[in-house]
Amino acid sequence: MADLPLAPGETIGILGGGQLGRMLSAAAARLGFDVAILDPEPDAPAGRVAAHTIVAAYDEPKGLQALAALASVVTFEFENVPAAAVAQLAEMGVEVAPGPLALRVAQDRLEEKTFLNAHGAPTVAFAPADTPEAAVKAVATLGAPALMKTRREGYDGKGQRWVEHAADAARAFAELGGAPVILEAAA
């Protein structure tokens, strides 16, 4: 476990070497930290600025062990890395921030809103839907317009559709691939 705050010269591990990982690596380097990136892509953008690059799947045990050996603390560049990998790093004794629970909750919009409400944080009204029929019913209950979002792996507006009328919900559900969704009332 790392003694926080970290001292310059220590290594920050990052799961993910995309553009966000690159920006985080550059900022860490300016503050005097080394960065170790774990990413499945050999030419990940963050690898160009990180002190260490580990090319492995996010849940590859040897890759995780290599990252744990290098890093005083580990984070992740986005919420779509496997929560189990973050849990494995924590089990190895590596300080991981945010932790596995935060990542798991953030990976599912329904779980996220339910968690927030359970802990006293208000959200817009919402309803889950696993079928086109359930989506139509959810919009009828919440009122239109409503924002339909995939429960997992959406980002930067991807995986979202505005539903202007309950009758449009089945079409929007199909456009999003038929995966489980959450509908949010317009604020």
Predicted regions and their residues:
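CheY-like receiver
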Residues: A66-L67, F115, A138, R171-E175
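Short secondary-structure boundary segments
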Residues: F78-E79, T150-R151, A185
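Conserved ATP-binding module of the ATP-grasp superfamily
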Residues: P122-V124, P145-M148, G159-A187
